[in-house]
């Protein structure tokens, strides 16, 4: 049974769905009572993909969870966010983060100290939206940036993705919200405490920092199929530099096979407990119970990230099967 509390849905840019179908999913989520729909930027452009979601909906919040800040200058991010917030009538939320350094290097992007870059990036976005004279930092420097139309909300919410303690503390200090990911409820509770403490230290009201947590969700009545689906997504995350600290397991053979392109072999070597730690899997009752654990850990908005079951993305099933207020 899912409670009537806030719930979000994430649609992956690499789901293979045409943008129009993503919009249809967003409308279905809105009709089912979801509070927010996000685009997760994998290989596509999350900000561009927010357009069809906004066009298809009328009340649900739409945002990115997340967009890779390194891919776009902060002035461009601010201009795009202002347009999306205007188009949505004030429903847009900008979720930012950094892909891992190896991926950004692959894209030919310059490397900067992550904390400094994120803090300055947010400052530039806010300066542009507020019409301030400019910003001068160690990485970014801008003059006043004109916009064609005044922002619908000069203070539109900016959320930061954070995994480690330093980025969590930065989010608590400067962001409107934090986006957690790849965490067990226990790890999420620790992250919540870090964010709240940092907000208080900065003289902010801790509860004003929204805690969003992406919950990978593999929904299937066949428990074994759901467990397989949960394990199948681990190799992709095993290559993330933070994997050892996130999963508490070296995952050496999984990483070796994944780097060699043997994804099937990598999946076979995934310890089930690693997948269990951050994936809600099983039938609606099992997934719903797991999501409630995140709420008890202090998460304000769990965001369901549907995981393929035997190769098929179960968006429609997740939207209806785990809808807010639905009993199972």
What annotation goes with each model-predicted range?
Residues 1-328:
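Active-site-adjacent structural elements that line small-molecule/cofactor binding pockets in enzymes
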């Amino acid at each position: 049974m899912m409670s009537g509390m806030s719930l979000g849905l994430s649609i992956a840019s690499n789901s293979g769905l045409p943008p129009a179908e993503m919009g249809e999913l967003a409308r279905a989520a809105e009709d089912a009572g979801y509070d927010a729909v996000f685009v997760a930027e994998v290989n596509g452009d999350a900000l561009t993909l927010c357009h069809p979601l906004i066009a298809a909906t009328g009340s649900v919040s739409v945002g990115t969870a997340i967009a890779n800040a390194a891919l776009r200058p902060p002035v461009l991010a601010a201009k795009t966010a202002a347009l999306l917030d205007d188009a949505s009538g004030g429903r847009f939320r900008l979720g930012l983060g950094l892909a891992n350094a190896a991926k950004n290097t692959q894209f030919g992007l310059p490397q900067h100290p992550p904390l400094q870059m994120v803090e300055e990036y947010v400052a530039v976005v806010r300066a542009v939206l507020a019409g301030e004279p400019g910003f001068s930092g160690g990485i970014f420097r801008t003059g006043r940036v004109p916009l064609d139309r005044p922002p619908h909300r000069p203070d539109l919410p900016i959320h930061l993705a954070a995994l480690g303690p330093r980025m969590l503390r930065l989010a608590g200090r400067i962001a409107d919200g934090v986006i957690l990911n790849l965490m067990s409820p226990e790890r999420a509770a620790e992250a919540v405490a870090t964010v709240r403490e940092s907000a208080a230290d900065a003289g902010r009201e801790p509860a004003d920092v929204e805690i969003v947590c992406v919950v990978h969700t593999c929904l299937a009545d066949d428990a074994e199929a759901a467990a397989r689906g949960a394990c199948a997504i681990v190799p992709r995350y095993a290559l993330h530099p933070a994997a050892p600290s996130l999963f508490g397991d070296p995952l050496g053979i999984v990483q070796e096979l994944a780097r060699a392109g043997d994804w099937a072999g990598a999946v076979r070597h995934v310890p089930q407990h690693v997948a269990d730690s951050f994936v809600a899997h099983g039938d609606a009752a099992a997934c719903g119970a797991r999501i409630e654990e995140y709420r008890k850990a202090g998460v304000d908005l769990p965001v369901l990230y549907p995981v393929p079951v035997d190769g098929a993305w179960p968006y429609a099933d997740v939207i209806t099967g785990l809808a807010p207020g639905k009993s199972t």
